[in-house]
Amino acid sequence: RDSMQGLGMMQIQSLTLSNDDDQFKLVRWDNVGEITRITNPITVDHTLLRQYLLPGLLRLLSSNRHHDLPQSVYELGTVVRDHKNASRLAFLVAERIGGFAAIRGRIQAFLRDLGASEYEIQTLPDNEGPWLAGRAAKVIVNGKHIGCFGEIDPFVGELFELKVPMNG
């Protein structure tokens, strides 16, 4: 939390309930393991327990698109994969300037704050997830893939009614 706040981000807490479109289709991610579905959902927007945090951040920025930029938010929250809870961190920055160099700098500062002195940043294949082709990477610490980051593809942003450059 201290690191994220030090990077100028505001903590949010989004709903753990989500839906297939937000979690998978709109952000171009595959489901990981078994999906925990709600037996009798009250709305079509809340049919499963989330596997990813980023779609909730995109929904939040979509709801706040009338506010001035930059908007920088993060969530340290729970996701459910294979019917098991797991803690995850995600952040999203909407800003007119920035791009891949800015997000990489934030990731490196975060890793430094965590004390990770040795890590690798490897380019992700094009069209993997919500990322803009050629502008995304994964982070490897001690041989383990711990996350990915990049610029959000403008096409994905438009699906959430966001027309501003974003990275996360």
Residues covered by each model-derived region:
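Extended beta-strand-rich architecture
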Residues: R1-G168
